[in-house]
């Protein structure tokens, strides 16, 4: 049985190397990642069971350890590798964003923030810190809360602005509900942070709310915030 499983693995790798990674199905990609099966299941069978259990690649990437381990033959090592691969992709996206001499590509910024934040199960508050030319200094996730709220304090944000010598920043947070509409609390904290940044001559450029499929720009939709 193991000989047959090994042949399957080699066939998949050969297909990838010959025809390119885009020629593989989602299950085949997972099988290449899983790499090896066990005495009872091939890597392809494990990939099929994982997909059947969790539904799609996005769900698999965002699954918790217990859900991942519920497939017999998959454990902590593969889960850790999967999370590492996911983070590598995130950091690669950030490198692409940093290549912008100035942060003028709004859609690219939205796409980056959406990819980083939308799959978190708890509300997470983040910031892009920028220099005076609106070049990116850092991306940091600053506060994390429950499924429907995160307590946000302006003071640590201002302190981080001073530490990084940032001249401007873009705030973002996710709504685990999937809805991107801003709440009254979102408007209130935006104004508090904007006022706090004014005291240190830093500018708040926007506050983005991340839903499942959409983003909401508080500044674009509510010009009063910019005044």
UniProtKB/Swiss-Prot annotation:
Give all cystine bridges in this chain. Answer: none
Q: Where is this motif: JAMM motif?
A: 173-186
Q: Name one Pfam family in it.
A: RadC
Occurrences of domain MPN (ranges): 102-225
Residues reported in the UniProt entry to bind Zn(2+): 173, 175, 186
- Any one of the GO BP annotations: proteolysis
PROSITE patterns registered for this protein in UniProt: MPN, UPF0758
Q: Which GO terms describe its molecular function?
A: metal ion binding; metallopeptidase activity
The yes or no answer to whether the keyword Metal-binding is present is: yes
Does rRNA-binding appear among the keywords? no
Q: Which keywords describe this protein according to UniProt?
A: Hydrolase, Metal-binding, Metalloprotease, Protease, Zinc
Q: Which residues form the signal peptide?
A: none
Domain of life of the organism in this record? Bacteria
Could you tell me which NCBIfam families the record lists for this protein?
Answer: PRK00024.1 (NF000642), radc (TIGR00608)
Concerning its family, UniProt says: Belongs to the UPF0758 family.
**Protein name (database record):** UPF0758 protein LPC_1989
What species is this protein from?
Legionella pneumophila (strain Corby)
